[in-house]
Curated annotation (Swiss-Prot):
Protein name: Uncharacterized protein R392
Domain of life, per lineage: Viruses
Residue ranges of domain TR mART core in the record: 161-380
Highest classification ranks of the organism: Viruses, Varidnaviria, Bamfordvirae, Nucleocytoviricota, Megaviricetes
Length: 400
């Protein structure tokens, strides 16, 4: 993925004709195209793609066949973050399937797909999709993660007083704007980041945008106040000076995140080929990114089949504002050793590595197995121009 900045200056025009739909409706559109004889080959390809578990799972060897018993699946789903969405999507799939059976069209797609005639394709896909998010795994030990954890952003002369001084400045600035950083770390990060993504799409003022956010007025206010905190700290000389004195000129942080290849809300899966990541690729993240500057006890709980680990290199330029905030113990979850990277930041991929760890399947008598975690090594940039320049240099070195 290569980005080039145009010299043409213009006022952006937003024409957001994006059709957002629940997963059952996206699949329904593919099925109806097949039933009506519209671009059958392409729509069959889309369905097969959705039926492939590799679409949802970064590392397929970490995943088993999931739960075949629907009652067990529903019972587990009720206790997960995505549980209600799963139940609603299952209800929609049943209604759509009943409609197809009533019109005697359900067998058409199944016959073309080579599936048993009574198969409910929508239900089958939904179970695969949600199962990857709610299946539980536990790490047997930290074998293989030692090198990943072996990061330290501080100079040797750093003292606890230095760290406390930074936290005090962050805390004072945050309180000035009704503690948005504290709110973010207390669980509202999901909705704040959702709002950031809506802004990126130009949909924050759309009539239906609030349905994606809990307590939208409050979240919008927090998001705006977070920008105020970032801006004030960016120009706070005392804060910058302390950071420069105790942080290395370059250091690394880690973050476990979902990196989905199938992310087009219109359901057009033919863009997948354009979403491959490689060395030199420029990544834009429209939301804030929580990272850790070292190991903490529960980090292994963030590893799942749908996630990769970002290892992010941060250059600490002396006497310049920072696009990240040292939150650390000011966070509501103090043990996470958090450094928060600002929304709308750019990253350039320097390497894609794989780390071997060991894990246990909770559902298989704690039998330990090796597992390879995908680690994407990236460098942080404040703006697209700097990212593109670095990407060009990196690509030149790689190609040579």
């Amino acid at each position: 993925m290569t980005i080039r900045q145009s010299s043409v200056q213009y006022v952006p025009y937003f024409n957001n004709r994006i059709k957002y739909a629940r997963i059952p409706y996206i699949i329904k559109e593919f099925l109806e195209n097949i039933i009506c004889g519209i671009d059958i080959e392409k729509n069959v390809e889309n369905i097969n793609y959705l039926l492939d578990i590799n679409m949802y799972v970064q590392n397929p060897e970490f995943y088993n066949n999931g739960y075949d018993d629907l009652n067990t699946f529903l019972e587990i789903s009720e206790n997960t973050y995505f549980g209600q969405s799963f139940i609603e999507d299952m209800e929609l799939s049943t209604k759509i399937d009943e409609l197809y059976k009533k019109n005697n069209t359900n067998h058409i797609v199944n016959k073309i797909m080579g599936l048993p005639l009574e198969t409910n394709i929508i239900e089958k896909i939904i179970k695969k999709y949600y199962d990857t998010y709610q299946h539980k795994f536990s790490i047997d030990n930290n074998h293989g993660l030692t090198n990943l954890y072996n990061i330290n952003p501080f100079r040797e002369i750093t003292t606890n007083n230095d760290l406390l001084n930074i936290i005090d400045i962050v805390k004072t600035t945050d309180k000035k704007y009704q503690t948005p950083i504290r709110e973010y770390t207390g669980g509202k990060h999901i909705w704040i980041n959702c709002y950031c993504q809506l802004i990126n799409l130009g949909l924050e003022e759309h009539n239906e945008s609030t349905q994606f956010i809990k307590n939208p007025d409050n979240i919008v206010e927090i998001a705006k106040n977070m920008n105020h905190v970032f801006n004030e700290l960016y120009f706070n000389y005392q804060y910058i000076n302390i950071i420069d004195n105790i942080f290395k000129n370059e250091f690394e942080v880690i973050s476990s995140q979902t990196f989905l290849y199938y992310c087009d809300p219109t359901g057009q899966t033919n863009i997948v080929d354009n979403l491959n990541i490689g060395i030199g690729s420029v990544i834009f993240i429209p939301n804030h990114l929580s990272t850790s500057y070292g190991s903490f006890k529960t980090f292994k709980e963030f590893i799942s089949p749908t996630k990769v680990i970002y290892k992010i290199k941060i250059t600490n330029y002396p006497n310049k504002g920072k696009n990240w905030i040292f939150i650390d113990t000011y966070s509501r979850v103090q043990e996470e050793k958090e450094i928060l990277i600002r929304a709308n930041s750019y990253y350039v991929i320097e390497d894609i590595d794989y780390v071997l760890i060991e894990f246990n399947h909770d559902d298989f008598d704690n039998v330990s197995e090796p597992y390879v975690v995908k680690v994407i090594v990236m460098r942080l940039f404040d703006d697209v121009t700097s990212a593109v320049i670095y990407s060009t240099k990196l690509n030149t070195v790689v190609n040579d």
